[in-house]
């Protein structure tokens, strides 16, 4: 615990959109400068700050890390967007939009290039405090501009973060890097096996419309020269509890086996009671249609829940909330949720390398 994130008087509120003031505080803590900031006298030109956020804004203003919405307004209660927080973090990593390293308009694209932004830690449509935490963790494991040292190591070297407190996080980053290296070597051998469990809870206002879980296993044997001759097997069970208003007089509890199989350019689907299907399809189209192409061999650190090392290698459990798009749910649920957004979406994965 390096003290980067603090909750509100109502808890951590990870599903709440962050304000500009909250994001400013997070950035100062990320840099290990909270104690220094609290000693500053407020002289910044922004007149709309209430009090607690003044030290953080002053530090960022003094160090060229944050600007106001105008010459005299910071808009502390305004929502912090993914673009804004990415810009904050890029500046913390030593990149300067003022000096032309990137532009605010392309901050997300540049963040992706340097390994800061990914599909797991960042949501541009619904940016939450959860994303702030995930992106901040990723930033600590991202190389500082012009060096091969990650931000965490720089903060320790600068004395901004206690070396003892940072040790366990540094070890976690090292284990994650080792796992990803091993996973990439495994991918080069063309075979993959992955267990996962997708969970979804759908609400409309305060009414819960649907609960879903789908444990599954994916196995692939890639033909790296001719992808369409690759083999993929996907097996799982879809379990749903549905609000009667959606069931239209039908069952409100559903349990259904689902099995997909691909080989030699043919995609086979066994949807249980919904029928069996067979169609010609390329391997790339299968991956894109199921959003599996987003699951590469590497695991972003913000998704990892645990790493276990044993004599047979390493096992990582991780969560990929943003990977499976609504397209996959539409396919599984037959368009049942047209016009209704999924409130929470989890995919828990266990991978070995």
Predicted regions and their residues:
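Feature responds to low-complexity, polar/acidic, surface-exposed segments characteristic
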Residues: 1-54, 63-83, 89-126, 139-177, ...
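Conserved long hydrophobic alpha-helices within structured protein cores
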Residues: 24-26, 86, 312-318
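Trp-centered recognition loops
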Residues: 124-129, 346
